[in-house]
């Protein structure tokens, strides 16, 4: 009979450990930035311009890091895909697919805001702030700095979550 009690206790203990470990995974809300976002060109402003014809960005965000893949059709009709993965530690991480910058660092400001510092050849060329609206349906990104041609830019992009 003692062996039966031990088995029941052991089984209950294992179940409790599994629930405690898996519950946070299954029941936590995902990061508001995570998901697929589509640029609303008509609501966005690009200075000096021109704006891209379209852009779709996919974010995967955890408490420690952000991964981004963004595919746009430029004003000239070319397809450009930019990608990076960066930890929220202020260090520079490589970026591929854009002529404007070659590294980025990421900083989590709050649950809905991420700041990026973009560099080209070690020099800061742009800062970007991404803010997800409280309802989680839209995201505003402001970018200031210079583009690859050295022109000052001040972009305000609006994205809608798919």
Model-identified regions with their sequence ranges:
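Intrinsic-disorder/low-complexity peptide segments enriched for small residues
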Residues: 5, 13-16, 37
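N-terminal secretory signal peptides that target proteins for export/translocation
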Residues: 1-8
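Sequence-pattern detector for short linear motifs
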Residues: 8-11, 142
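Bacterial N-terminal signal peptides
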Residues: 10-22
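Hydrophobic small-molecule pocket/channel-lining residues, especially in calycin-type beta-barrels
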Residues: 26-162
